[in-house]
Structure formats: structure tokens, C-alpha cells
Amino acid sequence: MTKFYRAVFASLALAAVLAASSVNAREFVMGHTGQPQMTFSGVGTQFAEKLKELSKGDMTLSVMGASALGNNREGLEQIQQGMTDFWIISTGLLAQFSNAVSVFDLPYLFKSEEAFIAFMSSPLAMEIVAPLEQKGIKALGYFPYGWRHIHSNVAVRKPEDVKGIKIRTEPAPIRMAIFKSMGANAIPMDFGEVFTSLQQGVIDAGENTIESIESQGFYTVNKYVTLDGHILDPMLIVISKITWDSLNDAEKAIVQEAAAYACEWGQKNTFGNCKAMIKKFKDAGKPEIIELTPEERSKFREATKAVYDEYVNSVGKDVYDKIMKFQESFAEAAPQS
């Protein structure tokens, strides 16, 4: 755990201990869309276990994964209405509520996994998502979803290889613009429709994390995965503002500490899990894994420069500049997961 998180949550934990007698018996519900083998499914489990431990059994959490409570759009509506207490979600799906959150969609933003982990544990990272509270969604902490890569029936080694292909993206303007800038036909589509659409030829390709490519079986209908890492996707544990406001100080402290613990677990496990899946793909010989050289990856960054020109001011040039300054001491490292 970083020094920042240690300092903050040590004080919160102390507050919880001092006010332990005021912790009430509470039953919460968390939803997410992850499959059991995905790291963020484990994050939900870790959060539930730590919440129960810290509250000495008074606060319990039922985790409903694999879209049992609905898709992410439905989940966010439930969070805003206070029908569901917690959700685990990618920042890319929160851009509709805050322009600043869209900064994480800018292509090739983070220099390395190390830089990403350090930034996610910084005060600035929490400042970026603070405006979500005005929309009824409170962010509790970050962990990585992983690098997003191109999976396709075309061997993609340079931006020109993407030209003309029909690629599914999340319905977020910047994510669509990334592939439009390379000449692809970017098609926004609900995640649950991707496999069938690939199978039926409605789309030629998608862009997802290795965990999603593996867990959803996309590799069975696409021949290639190109490790371009155009986005390093942050995930958030969020709580309904309605639920948050119903908690007393001791309960809030326990929720924050449990979330910090679960997010740190996610930070430690996501990239390793993705690397293990890549090794499994390589050993099986399917799909073919295409690893880009630094020179090849730089061509993708150059090809998407227009996305920055179009969107950096709308997401907040000051926020972007702060992220880049934060990374100055970190070396560039190509994604291996």
C-alpha cells in the first residue's frame, strides 16, 4: 500500500476503532459484470471479506457478479437510485457523468504499469473522480482492469492494418475516435453482444483486456491479439451516494479501509493474471499473440495524435498535464500483459 493510502486509511481505521460501538448491522449488495476467473471478480470478494472482518461481522456484503444484477448501464442506474449499494466499473463507462474522467480514455496515456499503479494511488487520481458524487456515485478506490488490446481476424502490426475493419468499441466518444483516427469503422456495442457479433461477422474485431478476451472466448472467433495497449483501463469500486450518506462515521471508515484493501489486492494481481493468460495463449498457439516493438507502438501513438488535438481541452488540459508531469520520473515500458 502506498504511503498516501497508509496515512489516510490508518487514521480512518483509528476512527473506526474509537467508534466501534456505533457500527450497526448492515447488509449490502454489490454488482459487477465480471466472470469468476477475472481479477475484478476477486476484488469484489476481497472487499466483502475485509468489510465483514473489520466490522466484526456487523457489515455483510453479497457480491453478484457475471451481470446477475444487469449490465453496467443498468447497474449505474441502480447505484444512482440507491437500489444497489456498490458496483465495480471501468472509468470509460463513467465518462458520461464527468468530462474529467474521460482523460483515462486518451490513447497511450500511461508510460508503464508502474506509472499507472503509482498514479492510481495518488491524491490527484481521487480528485479526478470526485465530481461523480454530484451524479449520485462516490468512488472509493482504483485498481487496473488491464491494457486494452486489439483482437481481430487481421494481423495488426501497424495503424494501416486497422483501416476499414469493423471494430467494436465501448460507446464512449474518445474510444471510438481512437479507431476512427486509424481509418477503422468504430461500432459502439454493448459488451454482451460482442461474441455473437464476431461469430456472425457483424464486426471483424474488438478491443479488450486480456482477461476479457479469455473469459468471453473472443480468442475462439478471432485469430490474432495485438498487444498495442492503446488504453490502460482503470477500474473503480463505487458506492451509491444514497448508501454512503446513510452511513455513520465509523461505518464510512470501515468501508473506505475495506475498499483500499481490495483495490490494493487488484493492483497486485491484475497484471500477473493477464500475463499468465498470454502465456496460456502462446503455449496453445491460439490466438496468435503479436507483440509490438517500441518503434511499431510509437507509430500507433502518432496515428492517434488527432484524438488529443480534438479532446484534450474538453477533458481538461490541466488534468492531462498533471498526469504527464506525474509520470516524468517513470521509464517507458511496452505492455506485456
Label each PLM-derived region with a short phrase:
Residues F9-L18:
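Hydrophobic helical h-region of N-terminal Sec-dependent signal peptides
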Residues M1-A10:
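Bacterial N-terminal signal peptides that target proteins for export
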Residues A10, A25-A115, P123-S337:
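N-terminal secretory/targeting leader peptides
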Residues V17-A25:
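Sec/Tat signal peptide C-region and signal peptidase I cleavage site
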